[in-house]
Every structure is written in structure tokens, then in C-alpha cells.
Amino acid sequence: MNIRESLEALEESYMSPYASLSSRTRGRDKPEQLCDMRPEYQRDRDRILHSKAFRRLKHKTQVFLAPEGDHYRTRLTHTLEVSQIARTIAKTLRLNESLTEAIALGHDLGHTPFGHSGEYILNKICEDGFTHYEQSVRIVEVLEKDGRGLNLTWEVRDGIRNHRTSGHPSTLEGAIVRLSDKIAYINHDIDDAIRARMFTEHELPRVYTDVLGHSVRERLNNMIHDIILNSMDKPAITMSEGMEEAMQGLRKWMFDNVYKNDIPKAEEGKAQNMITQLYEYYMGHVDKLPVEYVLLMVNKGEKKSRVVCDYIAGMSDIYALSLIHI
């Protein structure tokens, strides 16, 4: 018995009957020889962590475009926070922590530069539309490794694709990431908005904070504990009705008072103009694309519009800004 087999046996001995065992994965699109040391989901976690797309998240906007100060969230810090929350829940519920972490680390790989305003404009101008969750899957299936993709397991790709609000992950680990994403962005975006002096903690609606908690720390603890208590030894990941209603209410309040506020929207038109300018330039100058993107058209028959959107979506905010005067 090698190290991987020992770890797989350990999983079977202590994990919940509802956990996704590494030894029972539905596998990869392209079969590979098993690793002697690492179970399959751990290999996926490592591949995502070492990918170019993951590294670029450090310079991609979460809510505030090019914020002044070192303590605002980026896509990378958000991703790490989602991973921490999700792993805490998965470990306590005796589910597969490696699968959970892999999904969490990969869930936002497809986000565009300039936050949701970048996604909005790419969805308008790309011939086949654009969503960050489908782009995240496209990155791991096609774009990474010069067009070869990361060849991740089915369960990780399913969790990445279905982390959105309307998604239905096929594993409990994917369901954990889906809820952890909401918990992270609501609480940490509140923290960033308070730092930006958009409002104070005391101005948050009491009807929601009396249930969720009156600080970021309280809310995180209460929401995580609620999920654990309502999901322990059950075949579903759920919150109590009161906690979920309060979370959804605060989420709506955040959309009205933060995401649609004048401060984060002040640069939105500028960001959309920059994305449009880049799209029009590369549609007319395909020869300026990196060779790996050109080869997607030559070798795989990908549409020019699709490949141009791939290239722009992969840019960091900083890199996109540096190209505006090309």
C-alpha cells in the first residue's frame, strides 16, 4: 500500500457517508496515472494553486476599482477567505477538505479585470456571451497550460461551474463553497465599504444584524456555526430559515447601498470603455494576441471573438490599464 492508498483508506475510515471520497471520483476527461502520494482532489488543489490564472487574481478587483490603501479585498484575498470558511465547514462536517479547497480556489478564476463591470461589458460584446463561472471552467479545461487545460476531476469542475447563486452542485463540498462564497463577500465587502466610509457598522439594518451579528467576526462565526448545526450528518448543506432570510436581506441591502453606490460605480463607465477599447483593438489586430491564443483559433477552430474575450478576461486590472494606449 502506497502513501496515496493509505490516505484514501484514512478518508474511508473517518469521513461522513455523505462525503466525496477521493478514491471514488468520476475521474478526469483525459485519464492519468495515479500519484503515489497525493489523492486526486489534492492534486487538483495543487494544480489550481500553481496556475497562472490563480496568480493573476491578486491584481483583480473585488468591489472597489484601484482602491487607495493596502487593506481592500482583491479576487485573490476573497478566494482565500472563501477557502478558509469552506474548509472549516467541511472539516467539521467530516466532508472532503481537499475537494472543498480545490473548488474554492478555482471558483473565481474566470473573473474579468475591473470586477463585475468588466463581466457585464464582456457579456454584452462577446458573440456567445460571457459569465465568470463558465469562464472559470474554460480556464481549467482549455486555457491553462497553453491550451491543454489542467485536466481536473469531474467533481472539482462541477463545483466551480455551480458555485453561482442559481447553481446546484452535485457534491456537498461544492454546496459548501457556494454558501461560503456568499458569506465571504457579504461580510468582507461590508468591511471594505466601512473602510471606504460609505457607512458605519451602526448604519447596517438592525433587522438583519440582530440575527447575523453586529460585527464581521460575529457574523462569520454565527453563519458558519448555523450551517454546521443544520447540516451535521445530513445529505444537504443548509442554513436555518431565519439565518438564510437575514443573509439574503443583508445581501439585497448591500446591492442597493454598496454595489450600486456612486463610489464603486464612479469608475464603472471608464472600466467598460476600456474593456470595449481592448476588444475592438484585438478584434482588428489578432496578430497582437499571444501565440497560445492564436493557436486556439488555428488548431482548435475557436472563434476570434471567443479568443479575444479569453485574453481580455484573463488580464489583471493593472495589465489592462497598461494596454489602454496601445
Task: Indicate where each model-derived feature is located.
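Active-site flanking loop/helix segments enriched in acidic
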Residues: 29-36, 40-77, 161
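Internal helical hairpin/lid segments
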Residues: 215-287
